[in-house]
């Protein structure tokens, strides 16, 4: 049963400027694994923007706002075939469990100007 749906869109260039202005944001927002997974890309910012959107979409799927859980409580890893997988831990997992969520679906995409994440909580 679907418990919630969340979608978030991030303007890539605006996100890039934020990262340039505040370099410490990368470590605050993303796990070491996420940063390492994108380190070999010519431009990792679109992928980072999509992963940030995944966090926001997850909050929305639970009916929560920014600050409900830490940014490292939700992160994205790639499965062997390349599909993104949402990992939910810590406070986010507690809130999701209380809401009855036992399964997540995640879709990420980005084009020149925007990154989008779509999350379904079941």
Protein language model features and the residues they cover:
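Core catalytic alpha/beta fold that binds nucleotide/phospho-ligands
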Residues: 1-122
